[in-house]
Structure formats: structure tokens, C-alpha cells
């Protein structure tokens, strides 16, 4: 019920005719103003502290990043990491305890109530829960913010019908929420968020209540809206699959801190923080249990058993921009080469992935030297390579 009131309150305040926005606060950092000139959303050294019965709790600490105009920017982190707090700072539902938040160059923390109303008209919001009014039709739910704002009926009808067509719900115009699927309800929510032609669309776990197939359809819709309208989208999620499917850039939040950010292909191909690697663990080609049980540690001194092969973990980050030349890798390793596990995929045009292979070290070198030579040859044809053991 609280979430429903939050949604209705957001719609109502967004629909009131905006007054003049307050001027930027005196003494704003030059860094913030400069960054905001080229960014749709800019956070500079942002901190947020909440008072609790046990004292003050820091939800965010020194967070700095920019969202470029027209991109889809994903914020990911585990539950309680501070993702939702970040989104509430962007639309002015919370004010930062330190630092600055700017949307289209406007300092959100310096706005008065009229300025916040103007901001929310330019910043659409898609909520995790659909929060539709059950007694109103699809058309009426989408038209409600326009009706509150006093938009003439003919203009409301034209605008809402166009939006329902955009989100694929023209045939459900006169249906009631009870007859809609979860994905259709979220499409209504997306249409409602677009009624004021926002410059930025914020999505708060917009797919977390949906099944995988419906999630993909909603993500495809958001990507289509981004392309067709040139709309900047900021979404928060705890699912790396969502980031991979639709985002251009990702920021990883862990315990209120920004621990990693960059293009999605780079972060996925070469994660540099433990929190990122943990979030990616569900997408990584981990060794199946039966294969892991077969891999034995290399003996420190003794030779490998006859016929044994060294197991190499070869990784491609996509940094080179080309496709992995698996044939060249096999030729460089020489002898018998077997592919045991893994795969290659493309993210933002970059081929990346992991191959677990078994290769013969050869007999021309002592045991340690042969393995080192094999590893060196593998590294010439991949971004990373390491020895897992032997089979």
C-alpha cells in the first residue's frame, strides 16, 4: 500500500504545472557543472546518510559517475547495496547528504518544490510493482497524469493512443488491469511514465516481478524506446542478464560504494572487483562437477603420467576487438588438443568467453619447463591463460 501511495504521489506531483526552477546553489563545485554539460545525469562525490535508532547509517559513500545522453545505463548490486537510494536521489525523492546530483545540468539538491515538480515532469519513472488503479481502464491509467495536469481531452486521447501503440497495447485500450498479464501491466506502467515526454526514464527493478520470457520482451521494448525516442534510460537491477541484454554502461554498487564502472562488454569480459565477479558467477561457464573431479593438481617434481594432458583455462575479454582464432591457438599448442568446456559469446560486438582445453606438453623439455612453455604459447593467442591441472 505504501508503494501505491508513493506511485500516486509521484504521478500527482509530476503532473502539477511547474513553476520556475530554483537557481543552482551558490558555490556549486566547478567539477559538477563541467561534467553535467555533457551528461544527462551526473553524480559527483555523492553521499547519503540516514538517521536510525542506532545512529547514523551511510547508504552511499563518495559515488561519482556520469550517464551520457541517449544511453542505457545500468546500476547493479546486491540487495541493500544502495541502488534504490541512488535512483531516489536522481528524481529528487531524497536529497544527498554530500556531493551533487545533476539531471540535464540542473542541481537536484538545490531545487525548491516547484523545481522538483519540473524535474519529475522531465524524468519518467517505471516502478518495480505496477501499481495500476484497478477501477480504471488501461487508457485511463495512462491518461491520469495528463488529466491531473489539465491537458485537454483531445490532446490526452491523441497522446495516450500513440503511447499504447508504442508499447504494443493498442488492442487493450479499454481493458482493466485484472485482465492483463504481468508483462502487459508493466507496459502500461512504461506508457504512463512517458506521458510527459521525459528526457530521462528511470526504471526501478522493472523486470524483477516477471518471468524470464516476459522479462526479455520488456527489455526489448525499453531498447526500442531508447532507439526510437533517443531517451536516456537509467535502470537498477540485481540481475546481470538484464545488464547484458540492454545496457551500454554498467555501474556496480557494493555496500554503498561504486566499485566498478565501464562499458558492459569490458566489465563482463574482465571484471576487476570481487563484487562484480560474484554477480557474474551465474553467467560464467563454471566447470561441471564431473569434469572438475577429473582435473588433478600438477605434481611439483614428478613427470606427468603417460598420456596425461595439461588443462588450461583460456579467457578472451573482447579487448582486441576481433574473434578468437581458436585454430591458431590449437596450432600453437601443438600435438593433441581437446576442448573440454566453455564457450564464446558476443556483447556489444565484442567476442568474449572462456575455453577450458587439454593439451599435451610435449617431451622436449623437463616437466616444469614444458608446462611453462605451453602456457606461454596459449597467452600469445588469448587475453588470459592459466593452468588448472591435468587430466
Curated annotation (Swiss-Prot):
GO molecular-function terms, A-Z: ABC-type D-methionine transporter activity; ATP binding; ATP hydrolysis activity
Enzyme Commission code(s) on record: 7.4.2.11
Annotated residues for binding of ATP: 77-84
Residue stretches making up the ABC transporter domain: 44-280
GO CC, one annotated term: plasma membrane
Keywords noted in UniProt: Amino-acid transport, ATP-binding, Cell inner membrane, Cell membrane, Membrane, Nucleotide-binding, Translocase, Transport
Subcellular location(s) of the protein: Cell inner membrane
Lineage: superkingdom: Bacteria
Catalyzed reactions per annotation: L-methionine(out) + ATP + H2O = L-methionine(in) + ADP + phosphate + H(+); D-methionine(out) + ATP + H2O = D-methionine(in) + ADP + phosphate + H(+)
Key word Nucleotide-binding present: yes
Claim: Transmembrane is one of the keywords in the record: no
Disulfide bonds: none
Topology with respect to the bilayer: Peripheral membrane protein
Chief site of localization: membrane
SMART domains from the UniProt entry: AAA (SM00382), NIL (SM00930)
Assigned protein family: Belongs to the ABC transporter superfamily. Methionine importer (TC 3.A.1.24) family.
Assembly mode: The complex is composed of two ATP-binding proteins (MetN), two transmembrane proteins (MetI) and a solute-binding protein (MetQ).
Function in brief: Part of the ABC transporter complex MetNIQ involved in methionine import. Responsible for energy coupling to the transport system.
Protein name (record): Methionine import ATP-binding protein MetN 2
Organism expressing this protein natively: Burkholderia ambifaria (strain ATCC BAA-244 / DSM 16087 / CCUG 44356 / LMG 19182 / AMMD)
Gene: metN2
Amino acid at each position: 500500500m505504501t508503494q501505491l501511495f508513493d506511485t500516486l504521489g509521484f504521478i500527482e506531483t509530476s503532473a502539477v504545472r511547474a513553476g520556475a526552477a530554483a537557481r543552482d546553489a551558490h558555490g556549486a563545485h566547478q567539477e559538477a557543472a563541467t561534467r553535467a554539460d555533457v551528461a544527462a545525469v551526473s553524480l559527483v562525490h555523492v553521499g547519503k546518510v540516514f538517521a536510525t535508532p542506532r545512529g547514523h547509517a551511510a547508504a552511499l559513500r563518495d559515488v561519482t559517475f556520469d550517464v551520457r545522453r541517449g544511453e542505457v545505463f545500468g546500476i547493479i548490486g546486491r540487495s541493500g547495496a544502495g541502488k534504490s537510494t541512488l535512483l531516489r536521489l536522481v528524481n529528487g525523492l531524497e536529497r544527498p547528504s554530500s556531493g551533487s546530483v545533476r539531471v540535464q545540468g540542473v542541481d537536484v539538491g538545490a531545487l525548491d518544490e516547484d523545481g522538483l515538480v519540473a524535474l519529475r515532469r522531465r524524468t519518467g519513472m517505471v516502478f518495480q510493482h505496477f501499481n495500476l488503479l484497478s477501477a480504471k481502464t488501461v487508457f485511463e491509467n495512462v491518461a491520469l497524469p495528463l488529466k491531473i495536469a489539465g491537458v485537454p481531452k483531445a490532446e490526452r486521447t491523441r497522446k495516450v493512443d500513440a503511447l499504447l501503440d508504442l508499447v504494443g497495447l493498442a488492442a487493450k485500450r479499454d481493458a482493466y488491469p485484472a485482465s492483463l498479464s504481468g508483462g502487459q501491466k508493466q507496459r502500461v506502467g512504461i506508457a504512463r511514465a512517458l506521458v510527459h515526454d521525459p528526457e530521462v526514464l528511470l526504471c526501478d527493478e522493472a523486470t524483477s516481478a516477471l518471468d524470464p520470457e516476459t522479462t526479455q520482451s520488456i527489455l526489448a521494448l525499453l531498447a526500442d524506446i531508447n532507439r526510437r525516442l533517443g531517451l536516456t534510460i537509467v535502470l537498477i537491477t540485481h540481475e546481470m542478464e538484464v545488464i547484458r541484454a540492454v545496457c551500454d554502461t554498467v555501474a556496480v554498487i557494493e555496500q554503498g560504494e561504486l566499485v566498478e564502472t565501464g562499458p558492459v562488454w569490458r566489465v563482463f569480459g574482465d571484471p576487476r572487483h570481487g563484487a562484480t565477479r560474484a554477480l557474474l558467477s551465474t553467467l560464467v561457464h563454471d566447470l561441471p562437477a564431473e569434469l572438475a573431479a577429473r582435473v588433478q593438481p600438477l605434481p611439483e617434481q614428478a613427470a606427468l603420467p603417460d598420456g596425461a594432458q595439461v588443462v588450461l583455462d583460456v579467457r578472451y575479454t573482447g579487448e582486441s576487438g576481433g574473434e578468437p582464432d581458436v585454430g591458431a591457438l590449437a596450432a600453437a599448442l601443438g600435438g593433441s588438443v581437446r576442448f573440454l568446456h566453455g564457450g564464446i559469446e558476443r556483447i556489444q560486438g565484442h567476442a568474449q568467453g572462456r575455453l577450458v582445453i587439454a593439451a599435451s606438453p610435449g617431451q622436449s623439455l623437463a616437466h616444469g619447463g614444458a608446462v611453462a612453455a605451453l602456457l606461454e604459447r596459449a597467452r600469445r593467442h588469448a587475453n588470459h591463460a592459466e593452468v588448472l591441472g591435468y587430466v
